[in-house]
Amino acid sequence: MAESLMDIKRKIASTKKTGQITQAMQMVSGAKLSQIEKRAKKYQIYSDKVRQIVTHLAAGQLLELANAAESDTDSGDKSQVISVASLLQKRPVKKTGYLVITSDRGLVGSYNSTVLKAMMQMIKDDHESPDDYVMMAIGGVGADFFKARGLNLAYEYRGVSDIPTFNEVREIVKTAVTMFDNGVFDELYVCYNHHVNTLTSAFRAEKMLPISDLDVSEVADTNVEYLIEPDLDSVLESVLPQYAESLIFGAIMDAKTAEHAASTTAM
């Protein structure tokens, strides 16, 4: 009987310790969530301003591309536009790229399973052959998942910090843009959990490349003029890749925010 009481006391003590550890982990996750939410809001302000500037700078190229698509001609001017702003140019899709963002570890509730389940359904619905798509993975859970199923994993990155910086993930975003530019895939979707609030996230598959979120009609709403040196083409060749990189980084920030929220509620 004494031994039985001792066992009960040990279980009670063990349960209390587990509760203390879980509470501490929840507090840490909550602090990280608060920090990254503040940073994500600041980044959104920056991203919106960059988008506005890029839209103004690329307005001429966007109009020429639209006119070229409507007339369906192969003029010399059209090739000039494509060479200057290739990231804007839609091309026949022979292969689709998917950049899938998951966590490196568990204890995040259904965060990873939601993304991976939705991804497998997308592949099943949209592709008949494994040759039609290529995978890129941010996070060990996703990378291991795709490898275990024999999917074409062209790139993986593990160990993104809890509060990522652009310098930290520069390799990821530059690799994605370079692979698109080199024709490894003809369009890129970034797939992740979008942070709605602490209790809710929603799966997103956003088309990032070619750049398609620039609306020329917005230019008419402002009277801003830019002084450009040395010339517009040179500036666009530098700015457009950076803008594409900023879109991908924004998705990584959003996904990381959703991860911390999931970790907080899972405790």
Regions found by a protein language model. Name each.
Residues 1-267:
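C-terminal beta-strand-loop-alpha-helix "lid" module of Rossmann-like NAD(P)-dependent dehydrogenases
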